[in-house]
Amino acid sequence: MRSLNTGKNLLHWLASVDEDGIAWLHLQTDGKSVNVLTHAVMAELGSLVDQLEASEDLTGVAMLSGKPGGFVYGADIHEFETLKTAGNVANHMLFVHGLFNRIEALPVPSCVGVDGIAVGGGLEIALVFDRLFVTSSPKTKLGFPEVNLGIMPGYGGSGRAYGRVGTKAVLDMMISGRPLGSQDAIKNGLADDIVDNADDLEVAMRQWLLGCKGEKPSLTQLETAADATEIAAARDKYLKRVRADHTPAPAAIIDHVENFGHDKSAMSAGEVGVFPNLMIGRASKNLRRVFYLTDAVRKSARGVSGIKRLHVVGAGVMGGDIAAVGAMAGLDVTLADMNEAAIEGAIARAKKLFERRLKSDDKVAAALARLRADFDGNDAADADLIIEAVAEKLDVKRAVFQKLETVSKAGAILATNTSAIPLEDIASVLKAPERLIGLHFFNPVPVLPLVEVIWSKYSDQDMVNRGMQFAGQIG
């Protein structure tokens, strides 16, 4: 095994050539917990490609992640914010397109192994290689989520994916933004081979490369023109409920596939004429702003809440679903209500939810064991967090919290699910109003993983922080 000498110290790649002449490229983005395609990563890759092109004794090229549990999570979206004009964006794209085209054109066979997440630019770099191996892990996901930021694939992925899967599948991937699991990726042709786990990737890839005997395989294009029926179906499915001026990406994606369906390479190159204007447009800027804000909230929700026991007061739809989601997240949950039938109904609904989500009989049984009826309300005394989800009446909520304050632990968080009544109006009757925060769940709770954390002028900041950590804990 010898290193692939670029004449530079590589921070982001481990590159070597084995005794069979196979060049192994392992990406391990420096300073990041997961792999992302930063400008620095691309620059180093350019130096590596220079060496690959100059090497006369290679028999194949293989790429893997140097970080366990994931492949590549895409481009570094924060770096795109430094590209202020459409011209800046286009120039960056042309550099990456040129780099990826050079890898694709290497005269020896190439392959890539994906275990975990390969989305956005991560999938685009994977599609550059002749053969795509995936693991059967449920964590392996391949997709194009760019539409959620108001853009589309920009590193040639649209054409390369289209060549493999055709009009319908590539439109669904790019417009829905939903990733594919490994089995579905094999089924529709996006991926070529599947192995059990990450440890099997290198063995399978080596075997395939050796079998090629240095001969590059010829790759075909599934369709020679975009399917007009599928184009029309996509317009009907995806554009009926959106305004092009507010959400331009779906229409732009459909037009792009229709215009370049005759040639996958032209479709890849054609991204340079579409992506930059989407990137600098108002819709994408707004969606990226939401992404950054959401990411900041998620980061603030990290940490240990210290909450192990949850008590929910009110077994209606909201209260019952909050209790069920808590039990699914591994908390010990007690559910109280004046109406015993309401509690029993909530637990019956929870059982159906567990069966849909958890699948395994053992996991369903364990979740049900964590969710207990509390017909007399005594379990509030042991709870770390108490969430009230009773009728939206101020006097009712005040009475509930006055009682809870007397029976609960001093360090327990008192939380209301209200979205209509000011917290100060409830907290004003408490001896320790700083214990009260708002945890507003959105309905239906199991479907919408969103919790609004609210505080009053009285709320203790530590209680608020723990409430945010709890939201992250169950989400």
Where are the language model's segments positioned?
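Gly/Pro- and small hydrophobic-enriched strand-loop and loop-to-helix capping segments
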Residues: 130-154, 191-205, 334-336, 340
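Glycine- (often His-adjacent) and acidic-residue-rich active-site loop
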Residues: 65-99, 118, 148-150
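Amphipathic alpha-helical segments at domain termini/boundaries
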Residues: 1-28, 33, 124-128, 168, ...
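Rossmann-like NAD(P)-binding element
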Residues: 29-32, 341-342, 355-414, 420-424, ...
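Conserved CoA-thioester-binding segment of acyl-CoA-metabolizing enzymes
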Residues: 1-64, 98-101
